[in-house]
Design a protein with these regions (language model features):
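N-terminal lobe/hinge region of extracytoplasmic solute-binding protein
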Residues: 131-180, 588
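Ligand-site clamp/hinge motif
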Residues: 297-335, 344
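Aromatic- and charge-enriched surface segment that lines or borders ligand/interaction sites
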Residues: 18-20, 42, 145-147, 177-219
Length: 590
């Protein structure tokens, strides 16, 4: 399929639905990301194929014209039917995302739906094919700070040990046992002897050392967790000892993170050909899809699903009728799917910029924003499934805070706020845009001029926003299974928003309080220290918690074995299908 041709047709259809269309050559060059000269060549090529007549504009300022041979709807449906017959998912998703009328697809919507969700191939392979609404960022374990990417890493890689969320303790994984000295400075791990990487080599202690040394480089996500490592010694092929400069009872908890997934030392790292040792192996990754297959020689139980496919589709409005395994669907049109909701998945918050000169530096202004940001009112006026009101990082510790909007005027006067523009950052997620607009409108009622600044998902997740760009930012955080480590990471991870926006003075205080927290061996005392640290941040209004979101996923009714993954998704390695799907998909793999 010629995607450039249909990109042009959809673009011009939104100018006019007539078959004869006036246009500027430069506009086509822009949508094709080419020069005007190359755009003209393309048009002559299409004219030679007989699909259009091209009439260049004569004289400066005169528009060119195209006369199409066939209506766009007819051409789209012809190509779509061909793509369905060939199981060409890439072409189908491309057509569905074009800015063209949705009702064109109504007669074949059932066939389109059946291509996604659960599939059975001709050679009895069970496939879960799903759609994600954005391109993946990075799958480099040392760089990812996003829940979806971290979830995928747990499916294709393994950490040295794991954290059991139910029993609240570290359990064996790659390491079957470990020993730590009384001073918590020397940690020895004993590795299983038959773990294979995806490329066939046995995992050994040198791979553990290689992974940790790579992670100890500056500018990695886990760098802050490993700064105390003094030495890594491979005693033998399956024993490794890590010596620390200072006592750290928390050290083993870091090793549970997917950011410290053990990678092979003999393969140059390539996140598009990622080799690890997890239950699934990566067989294809590009901007359109990520395809995983079960790793037959996985050292634990082999996944029952044979293949998992993630297809990227960023135009969610056109795709509401297609099963989105990890988000919501139109349940009226997808009766085989059921909704699965979970409350308290992470926390949404606002963080103030401690680097930029301006009114946000004034505690009184931040307090005024605290009283203005009433999540109870937001929930009542805006969201049906807003989740629960937040006053702490943890849902179980949150209470409904008391807000006093009558104090706002006095606080603004104390901050000497004169109605100047305050830059308010938000991501481009639809619910974030909805909430940020509500916040801006509410602020205006109190005389606060918030100017919304849209920040891309990548920039927001990896702190790529420059410190001069905004005064405050709204963001969400989805923690891993280990709640204590998640909180430490939230405040200390250099890729996350707090470390990027907090002033050096606040960061220094966080570091001191975090160290005190890590050295405390008693869980109840650590809990009290967390509350104390969180209260210090919120009472000084360095950050304001909004709500703990409610997460919705669509699950096919035939899926069984669903267990919660730390990042709010279900563990693909444990999923199985009770009744085989009625549709047989073509097999394009062995």
């Amino acid at each position: 399929m010629d995607k450039d041709y249909f990109t042009m047709r959809a673009y011009l259809y939104n100018v006019t639905s007539d078959s004869d269309v006036p246009f500027k050559l430069n506009d086509l060059a822009n949508i094709w990301f080419c020069t005007s000269k190359n755009a003209k060549r393309k048009l002559h090529h299409y004219q030679a194929k007989g699909v259009l007549q091209y009439q260049p504009g004569l004289g400066r300022g005169n528009l060119s014209h195209i006369a199409f041979k066939e209506p766009l709807e007819k051409e789209v449906l012809l190509v779509l039917k061909k793509s369905l017959a060939e199981d060409s998912f890439s072409d189908i998703l491309f057509l569905l995302q074009l800015p063209i009328p949705k009702n064109w697809f109504s007669n074949i919507s059932t066939e389109i739906q059946q291509m996604f969700g659960l599939q059975l191939t001709e050679n009895q392979q069970e496939v879960l094919r799903s759609i994600i609404r954005r391109k993946l960022t990075t799958l480099d374990p040392l760089q990812t700070s996003v829940s979806m990417e971290s979830f995928i890493l747990t499916q294709i890689s393994d950490s040295l040990v794991k954290y059991d969320e139910i029993d609240k303790k570290v359990v064996s994984h790659i390491a079957h046992h470990w020993h730590v000295t009384e001073d918590y400075k020397e940690w020895t791990f004993y590795l299983r002897k038959s773990i294979l990487f995806h490329h066939g080599r046995i995992l050994d202690s040198e791979d553990v050392k290689f992974t940790l040394l790579r992670a100890m480089q500056p500018n990695t996500v886990p760098f802050w967790q490993l700064q105390d490592i003094k030495n890594i010694h491979c005693t033998n092929k399956f024993t490794v000892t890590i010596t620390l400069n200072n006592a750290d009872p928390f050290f083993i908890r870091y090793l549970c993170s997917p950011n410290l997934a053990i990678l092979p030392r003999d393969v140059t790292f390539d996140e598009f050909k990622l080799i690890a040792s997890g239950p699934f192996k990566m067989v294809e990754r590009n901007d359109e899809c990520l395809i995983l297959e079960a790793f037959d020689t996985y050292f634990l139980k082999r996944p029952i699903l044979d293949r998992v496919e993630f297809w990227t589709a960023e135009n969610h409005h056109t795709l509401k009728t297609i099963p989105m395994q990890f988000t919501s669907v139109d349940y009226e049109e997808n009766s085989a799917y059921v909704e699965r909701r979970k409350t308290g998945v992470g926390v949404n918050f606002i963080c103030f910029n401690g680097h930029k000169n301006g009114v946000a530096q004034h505690k009184a202004f931040r307090e005024a924003m605290y009283h203005l940001l009433d999540a109870q009112i937001t929930s009542q006026e805006l969201f049906e499934n807003y989740g629960t009101i937040a006053s702490n990082y943890y849902p179980e510790k949150s209470i409904i805070p008391t807000k006093h909007p009558e104090k706002i005027a006095t606080l603004l006067k104390k901050a000497n706020y004169q109605g100047e523009k305050v830059i308010f950052g938000t991501t481009q997620h639809p619910t974030a845009l909805q909430e940020s607009k509500w916040i801006c409108d509410r602020a205006a009622k109190f005389g606060i001029h918030l100017e919304e600044k849209l920040v891309s998902h990548d920039d927001a997740s990896y702190s790529s926003v420059t410190e001069d760009d905004l005064d405050l930012m709204m963001m969400g955080e989805i923690p891993a299974a280990d709640g204590e480590l998640a909180y430490l990471d939230f405040l200390n991870n250099p890729n996350l928003l707090p470390q990027h926006l907090f002033s050096p003075e606040v960061i220094k205080e966080i570091s001191t309080k975090s160290n005190e927290f890590k050295l405390e061996k008693d869980a109840s005392k650590r809990d009290a220290l967390q509350t104390k640290m969180d209260n210090w941040l919120t009472k000084n209004f360095h950050l304001i918690y909004l709500h703990h979101p409610e997460k919705s996923q669509s699950l096919h009714s035939m899926i069984r074995g669903v267990t919660e993954n730390p990042f709010g998704y279900f563990d693909l390695s444990k999923v199985w299908i009770e009744t085989l799907p009625t549709k047989t998909a073509k097999s394009n793999y062995k």
